[in-house]
Swiss-Prot record:
It catalyses: NAD(+) + (deoxyribonucleotide)n-3'-hydroxyl + 5'-phospho-(deoxyribonucleotide)m = (deoxyribonucleotide)n+m + AMP + beta-nicotinamide D-nucleotide. The active site is at K108 (n6-amp-lysine intermediate). It comes from Wolbachia pipientis wMel. GO terms for cellular component: cytosol. Its EC number is 6.5.1.2. Keywords: DNA damage, DNA repair, DNA replication, Ligase, Magnesium, Manganese, Metal-binding, NAD, Zinc. PANTHER family: CHROMOSOME TRANSMISSION FIDELITY FACTOR 18, DNA LIGASE. Zn(2+) binds at C389, C392, C407, C413. GO terms for biological process: DNA repair; DNA replication. Belongs to the NAD-dependent DNA ligase family. LigA subfamily. The keyword Magnesium applies. This is DNA ligase. The gene is ligA. It comes from the Bacteria.
Length: 662
């Protein structure tokens, strides 16, 4: 087994182990940050899909009933320095075309997120975040929390309260006399997720409420006041400000007094105070645009770099990774650090055997920030980046202008093929239960799954292969795997596109492509024609030149075309069904030009997409409407020549507010 495979397997085993402890045995051994650290180390193997690998939460625990959130419980975007906060403030000002925006600042409680539902004032249900869309039903457990309101006086209809459950530091010391828990966060998680509510009742759980859905409040500060009036616990540390200086001042004040608090916090949360503006800002794929978590400063530690080894990812990138003498950095035991690429190694002059300084900020993958050259032994050789792939022996290549070095043998390199297969069956792609990393490697080595479509013809080949003779396989486990594969023969278009593992086409880009082309045949036929003209694809808002070039490269290879034909013969790929079928903009291709006065270009695009439109930057005969603001460019003249209907800003506002064109 190669170094890459060993590390990949080790990380996956660790994640699976902690999943069982956290979700099934209620005995978590590591914090959320440490768990995220493992996942992001795993994602480091394939750095180009790092953003698409990140998830909002964890899958719902099968031991509990599932609760679907009416509004997703999204995570927050993170910042780790003042520049990140400044960027957040500037971005929302540009989006809303506002010079002054009121921001509410609150501490970020290091606890467990919850949602509580009230019907006509009566507490009826509570759920965890889960994966952000579906959580676990913990109604009976939340009901045992001392002081948690069971009835809200004068409340009619449905009301949802969200917040954070925690255990205070003083209570944790009493609870943890036998060192059963690693920290207060894990103790709270383990206590809340008990099948026996009596155990939960015996634990000193507390909470802070911070969100109210279904009320009439107009601002976040009003929400907090209302929650307090209804009898909920609300954190006393909060501040309203309209300036960057005010935001940073609150951060510094709380940072300096954090050890005087009787509960753990790991940063500050900034929220746009006006709820109407929050609604206008909307959400990205993973987080609300109206909020930011400014995590506390990075933690540093020194250790020895034992060895630099190379990982080969799904797209062929050779990524150097530092193997370290394990060191505790901010409560997390770090034994690996990212070295990014050969340019980074040369720039910092990193060598095996060096004493290095490790930086860890929040849940970001640890980085080497400094090398102690005074401690370096004489004649320590420079690290030489391999000229051949460590997995298949092929001569590596580096594209001009890129730092990444790649193995070109996309289909002959075992490491790449195994990683492609793992990606294909992963949770966000085909999600084939029972076909995990170890099983993929097992079937690949046996020659039973060499190509992606082999997965769906596995049953036929097993007729000639006695799998029951292999360790760990029996009649039941084989039947379960084949049933799992069979159940995944129907898939949505966006998940199918994502499953192919095309460079620069992550979950968000796959959704954009699916929404734009609607059906697999439309998408496939358009991609086949890319060699003739890719301007339409480049114009799709959010795809860009790199994504278009990557798709063009993918579809130029006969191997990929054959793979798609073989694969689609086994599948049913569902077309996109629009949730905006009654909108006059549904499935219309829209292009913007000129300056809009009432809203930013960014907000206009979001509004258009919400109504089912396809936003493009490329004007063609296929364009349905050109939205023209002040001082329109050459697109206006071209639209006239092509006969594309042109809407001015007043007409545009009628469309998005009234649903009419004139």
């Amino acid at each position: 087994m190669t170094n890459l495979e060993k590390m990949r397997e080790k990380l996956q085993d660790q994640i699976n182990y902690h999943n069982v402890l956290y979700h099934q045995k209620n005995k978590p051994e590591i914090s959320d940050a440490e768990y995220d650290e493992l996942k992001k180390k795993l994602a480091e193997i394939e750095p180009e899909i790092y953003a698409t690998q990140d998830s909002v939460g964890a899958p719902p625990d099968e031991r509990f009933s599932k609760v679907e959130h009416q509004e997703p419980m999204l995570s927050l975007e993170n910042a780790y320095d003042e520049q990140g906060v400044e960027k957040f403030l500037s971005k929302i000002k540009r989006f809303l075309i506002e010079d002054k925006i009121e921001i509410l600042c609150e501490p970020k409680i290091d606890g467990l997120s919850f949602s509580a539902i009230y019907e006509d004032g009566r507490f009826v249900k509570a759920a965890t975040r889960g994966d952000g869309f579906v959580g676990e039903d913990v109604t009976h457990n939340v009901a045992t929390i001392k002081g948690f309101p069971k009835f809200l006086q004068g409340v009619q209809g449905r009301l949802e309260v969200r917040g954070e459950i925690y255990i205070s530091n003083s209570d944790f010391l009493k609870l943890n006399e036998n060192d059963e828990f690693a920290n207060p966060r894990n103790a709270a998680a383990g206590s809340l997720k008990q099948l026996d509510a009596n155990i939960t009742a015996s634990r000193p759980l507390r909470y802070f409420a911070y969100s109210l859905i279904g009320g009439a409040e107009k601002s976040q500060s009003e929400v907090l006041n209302k929650l307090e009036a209804l009898g909920f616990c609300v954190n006393e540390h909060q501040s309203l400000t309209s300036s960057l200086d005010g935001m940073l001042k609150f951060y510094n004040e709380v940072y300096n007094c954090r050890y005087n608090l009787d509960y753990d916090i790991d940063g500050i949360v900034y929220k746009v105070n006006d709820l109407v503006l929050q609604n206008r800002l909307g959400n990205t794929h993973k987080a609300p645009r109206s909020a930011l978590a400014y995590k506390f400063s990075a933690v540093y530690a020194k250790t020895k770099l034992n060895k630099i080894f190379i990982q080969v990812g799904r797209t062929g990138v050779l990524t150097p990774v530092a193997d370290l003498v394990p060191v505790n950095v901010g409560g997390v035991l770090v034994s690996r650090a990212s070295l990014h690429n050969q340019d980074e190694i040369k720039r910092k002059d990193i060598r095996e055997g060096d004493i290095v300084t490790i930086k860890r900020a929040g849940d970001v993958i640890p980085q080497i920030v400094e090398v102690s050259r005074d401690s370096r032994l004489p004649n320590t050789p420079e690290f030489v980046f391999p000229e051949v792939c460590p997995e298949c022996g092929s001569k590596v290549r580096q594209v001009e202008g890129e730092a990444a070095v790649r193995c070109p043998e996309e289909f002959a390199c075992k490491a790449q093929m195994i990683e492609k297969l793992k990606h294909f069956v992963s949770k966000d792609a085909f999600d084939i239960v029972g076909l995990g990393d170890k099983q993929i490697e097992f079937f690949y080595d046996l020659g039973l799954i060499k190509q992606i479509h082999d997965i769906f013809t596995l049953e036929e080949r097993l007729d000639e292969f006695n799998l029951e003779e292999q360790s760990g396989w029996g009649e039941k486990s084989i039947a379960n795997l084949l049933n799992s594969i069979q159940s995944r023969r129907v898939i949505t278009l966006d998940r199918f596109i994502f499953s192919l593992g095309i460079r620069f086409i992550g979950q968000v880009a796959a959704e954009l492509l699916a929404d734009y082309y609607v059906s697999y045949n439309n998408w496939y036929n358009s991609m086949i024609e890319l060699s003739l003209d890719n301007t339409e694809l480049v114009g799709i808002d959010g795809i860009g030149k790199k994504g278009a070039e990557s798709l063009e490269s993918f579809f130029s290879k006969e191997h990929n075309i054959k793979m798609l034909n073989d694969l689609t013969a086994c599948l049913q790929i569902l077309p996109v069904s629009s949730n905006s079928s009654n909108s006059v903009l549904n499935n219309k291709i829209i292009v913007f030009t000129g300056k809009l006065l009432a809203m930013s270009r960014g907000e206009a695009k979001v509004r258009a997409k919400t109504l089912g439109a396809k936003v493009s930057s490329h004007l063609s005969a296929k364009t349905d409407y050109l939205i023209a603001g002040e001082k329109p460019g050459s697109k206006y003249k071209k639209a006239v020549e092509l006969g594309v209907e042109i809407l001015d800003e007043d007409q545009w506002h009628k469309v998005i507010s009234l649903g009419v064109f004139k």
